[in-house]
Amino acid sequence: MKHISFLVVVLLVGCSSSWCNGPYEVYWIDGVKSLGFNVGDGVYIGRIDEPKSIYANEKFISVYACPEQTCAYYYIDREKDHKFAGATEFVFGPYTKESFVELQKKLILPELTE
């Protein structure tokens, strides 16, 4: 019984999504996996569809994603993002791997591994 209680507590604590960092979470709707901004009560504002790899630091989120079957690199400027902002203000991409590596060095983006 102790093990079952412990398991229930572990499952209830923390993020229930596969990835979360602050208000950002990976969620699924109708079989589509998305990275979004959680505004509460199970409501998300989508940022990038079909993320495959996500890494974050205090300023940025780096994402390797394959929306519409085309894979590319993206980043989110966390300092500019908020629940009322339009995605074009803070979601940048798509980039090729080479372009993204240059941006990683210049902006100190979190490093991605595919």
Question: Predicted segment positions?
Answer:
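C-terminal partner/receptor-binding element of secreted or periplasmic proteins
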Residues: H82-E114
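A generic structural signal for short, solvent-exposed coil/turn residues
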Residues: I4-L7, S53, P67-E68
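Sec-dependent bacterial lipoprotein signal peptides
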Residues: M1-C15
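N-terminal export/targeting and maturation segments
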Residues: C15-F60, Y64, A72, F84-G86, ...
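Structural motif
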Residues: E68-D77
